[in-house]
């Protein structure tokens, strides 16, 4: 029988078995999952792409408010 696949937790680096026994996969725990979510919410992680400011995206689309 082959060994189960393992991955490293993206937050702490601990080995995580990829299977039903690991409900938080790819994270090792709920704590590591929430740390990662907090980093996304704080904009510490970003998806690569062109840098565009919000003003450039919507500058001509909306009427000014008075």
Swiss-Prot record:
Superkingdom to which the source organism belongs: Bacteria
Signal peptide location: none
Cofactor binding note from Swiss-Prot or TrEMBL: Binds 1 zinc ion.
Listed Gene3D superfamilies: Erythroid Transcription Factor GATA-1, subunit A
Pfam families on file: YacG
Cofactors that this protein relies on: Zn(2+)
Gene Ontology molecular functions: DNA topoisomerase type II (double strand cut, ATP-hydrolyzing) inhibitor activity; zinc ion binding
Residue segments, region Disordered: 45-66
BP GO annotations: regulation of DNA-templated transcription
Residue sites binding Zn(2+) per the record: 9, 12, 28, 32
Assigned keywords, A-Z: Metal-binding, Zinc
Metal-binding keyword on record: yes
Disulphide bond pairs: none
Function: Inhibits all the catalytic activities of DNA gyrase by preventing its interaction with DNA. Acts by binding directly to the C-terminal domain of GyrB, which probably disrupts DNA binding by the gyrase.
Family: Belongs to the DNA gyrase inhibitor YacG family.
Subunit comment: Interacts with GyrB.
NCBIfam families: PRK00418.1
Name of this protein: DNA gyrase inhibitor YacG
Natural source organism: Pseudomonas entomophila (strain L48)
Lineage per the UniProt record: Bacteria, Pseudomonadati, Pseudomonadota, Gammaproteobacteria, Pseudomonadales
């Amino acid at each position: 029988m082959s060994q189960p696949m393992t991955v490293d937790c993206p937050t702490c680096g601990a080995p995580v078995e990829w299977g039903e026994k690991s409900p938080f996969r790819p994270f090792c725990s709920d704590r590591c999952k929430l740390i990662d979510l907090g980093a996304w919410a704080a904009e510490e992680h970003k998806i690569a792409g062109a840098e565009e400011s919000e003003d450039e995206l919507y500058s001509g689309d909306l009427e000014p408010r008075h």
